[in-house]
């Protein structure tokens, strides 16, 4: 189990928190190898950039190293593959999604002295590059490209509708616990999609250590238990959701599901 609180996550680099999360979900996560690989990449970056004195040129060289020489890229073919959210597998495959690639860039960038911050934009994870005395530059970790205000506005409209307006709060830096919470939700969704229910159950159990009475997490846990043929526990979780969210559209559907599962249990017992 993940014995870390919000303060622990804030005290470490995002990629370190993600690795701890990955290990708690899947014990086969190659934690030690990942730390060794991160140290190797950092050493290689330090050597590659040692003669570059101009900070902006140094950062551009860092991006070229990351995306071109090391070959990291966004996984366009299987974006929702759970491997894109396990850091050890991102390091092995050189493929990921914005939050996993962004966490690597943040880790290496901070060690190299670059002023980078993570931003949980409504559509995806972004990085802001904050040179002293200048307006922030926003980077898409999926491909390393600069994102204009116009593009950010277009993304927001596509996500929230034609009346959406880009506001300063959309581009504020976010703390590690918030990102880790969203990372956990992303992993759970990917594992459910892949029907890897035992690992998905670990995600839900972890989420419930942070929000113990969240009816939506308990509903999701019920669904997972149902897939694992643990019908009595599934019924209990569904009933909890129905009692606490009676006006949710899912409540009526779950009542039908509870009746069906109860009937199946009675038939099995007889």
From Swiss-Prot:
This is UPF0162 protein VC_2176. Belongs to the UPF0162 family. PANTHER family: F-BOX ONLY PROTEIN 21, SI:DKEY-261L7.2. It comes from Vibrio cholerae serotype O1 (strain ATCC 39315 / El Tor Inaba N16961).
């Amino acid at each position: 189990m993940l014995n870390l609180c919000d303060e622990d996550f804030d005290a470490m680099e995002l990629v370190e928190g993600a690795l701890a999360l990955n290990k708690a979900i899947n014990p086969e996560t190659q934690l030690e190898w990942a730390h060794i690989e991160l140290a190797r990449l950092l050493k290689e970056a330090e050597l590659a950039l040692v003669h570059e004195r101009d900070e902006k040129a140094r950062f551009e060289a860092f991006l070229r190293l990351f995306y071109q020489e090391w070959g990291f890229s966004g996984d366009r073919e299987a974006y929702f593959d759970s491997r894109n959210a396990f850091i050890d597998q991102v390091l092995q495959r050189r493929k990921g999604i914005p939050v996993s690639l962004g966490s690597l860039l943040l880790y290496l960038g901070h060690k190299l002295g670059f002023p980078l911050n993570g931003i949980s934009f409504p559509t995806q994870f972004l990085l802001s590059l904050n040179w002293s005395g200048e307006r922030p530059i926003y980077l898409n970790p999926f491909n390393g490209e600069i994102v204009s205000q116009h593009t950010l506005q277009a993304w927001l409209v596509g996500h929230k509708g034609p009346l959406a307006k880009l506001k300063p709060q959309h581009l504020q830096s976010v703390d590690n616990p918030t990102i880790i919470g969203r990372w956990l939700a992303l992993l759970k969704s990917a594992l459910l999609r892949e029907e890897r229910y035992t690992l998905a159950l670990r995600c839900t159990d972890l989420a419930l250590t942070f929000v113990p009475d969240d009816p939506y997490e308990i509903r999701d846990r019920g669904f997972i238990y149902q897939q694992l043929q643990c019908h009595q526990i599934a019924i209990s979780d569904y009933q909890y959701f129905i009692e606490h969210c009676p006006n949710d559209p899912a409540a009526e559907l779950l009542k039908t599901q509870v009746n069906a599962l109860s009937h199946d249990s009675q038939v099995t017992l007889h």
